[in-house]
């Protein structure tokens, strides 16, 4: 019996959603066993060598709060690997944690990847997973995985649409007969909304806030359409004029204004996907095409409220006028 075969006896098959904001690990027979931020904290020594200090939730708490010799890094950007070595370290940590720290574990892994990923980016994910301890690596396109998980009738001879808004990318796909008929992947999602909120507050109030604060604003009072009540939240940051700490109040209307371009880009991607549908699928009434809107926890509730159509009416994702 070979060493990989022996290692396989100590391993469990895993499915990994390697997201820009969060990484989820699913174990066969147990369901989702890990859901942690895709963040790694590293310490640099005098020679510039890096050492992993923490991964996941503990590392995310360090973002924006570290001294000069410690950095908190997100190795994923726009749905793909931005730092190979750190992504490998993060994957190794999650694999070992999923196997209760067992070093002999060499599992078979299936990883979700964006539909618009290049061969170079796909190879980087495969090599990172193998270096992290995977025995075999398989891929599934994220729109297909999301559609199956959402319960869409992907094997039927009619169109289904999935709109998966994550941290780094938004995946829009039309599926039929077990395959992806057409898909659009845009690098506009939760992270871009955070950046838009930071820039909006910086320009309007001359106040500099961090990405964690922007995410908190988005998930607390963010919205894509006016609600019944105007919500507000206190924001703390650094006054760019005086350089001192400052507190101000921002309301939900301002947040909606700040992320309007990002919301429009996502709606435009949905429209483009519909325009690319084959004529045969277009024979089905639009109202009969099941559309699922999946939103990353780091983006809710900014887009969990209905979006307006072009006439300003409130529409559900299923009946959105595009």
Where are these regions (language model features)?
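Nucleotide/phosphate-binding catalytic cleft detector across ATP-hydrolyzing
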Residues: 1-165, 173-322
């Amino acid at each position: 019996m070979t060493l990989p075969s022996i290692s396989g006896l100590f391993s469990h098959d895993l499915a990994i959603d390697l997201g820009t904001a969060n990484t989820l690990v699913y174990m066969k027979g147990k369901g989702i066993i890990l859901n942690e931020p895709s963040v790694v904290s590293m310490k640099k020594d005098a020679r510039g060598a890096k050492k992993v200090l923490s991964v996941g939730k503990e590392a995310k708490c360090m973002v924006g709060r570290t001294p000069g010799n410690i950095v908190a890094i997100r190795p994923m950007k726009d749905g793909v690997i931005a730092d190979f070595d750190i992504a490998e370290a993060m994957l190794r940590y999650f694999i070992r944690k999923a196997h209760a720290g067992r070093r002999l574990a060499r599992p078979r892994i299936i990883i979700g990847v964006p539909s618009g990923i290049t061969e170079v980016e796909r190879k980087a994910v495969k090599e990172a997973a193998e270096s992290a301890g995977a025995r075999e690596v398989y891929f599934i396109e994220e729109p297909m995985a999301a559609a199956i998980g959402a319960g869409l009738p992907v094997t039927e001879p009619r169109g289904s649409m999935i709109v998966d808004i994550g941290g780094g990318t938004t995946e829009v796909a039309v599926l039929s007969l077990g395959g992806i008929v057409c898909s659009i992947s845009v690098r506009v999602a939760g992270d871009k909304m955070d950046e838009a909120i930071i820039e909006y507050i910086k320009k309007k109030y001359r106040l500099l806030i961090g990405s964690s604060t922007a995410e908190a604003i988005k998930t607390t009072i963010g919205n894509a359409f006016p609600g019944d009540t105007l919500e507000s939240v206190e924001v703390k940051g650094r006054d760019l004029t005086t350089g001192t700490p400052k507190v101000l109040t921002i309301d939900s209307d301002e947040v909606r204004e700040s992320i309007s371009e990002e919301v429009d880009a996502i709606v435009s991607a949905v429209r483009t996907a519909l325009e690319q549908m084959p004529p045969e699928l277009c024979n089905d009434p639009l109202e009969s095409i099941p559309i699922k809107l999946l939103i990353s926890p780091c983006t809710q509730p900014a887009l969990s409220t209905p979006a307006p159509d072009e006439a300003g009416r409130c529409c559900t994702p299923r009946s959105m006028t595009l």
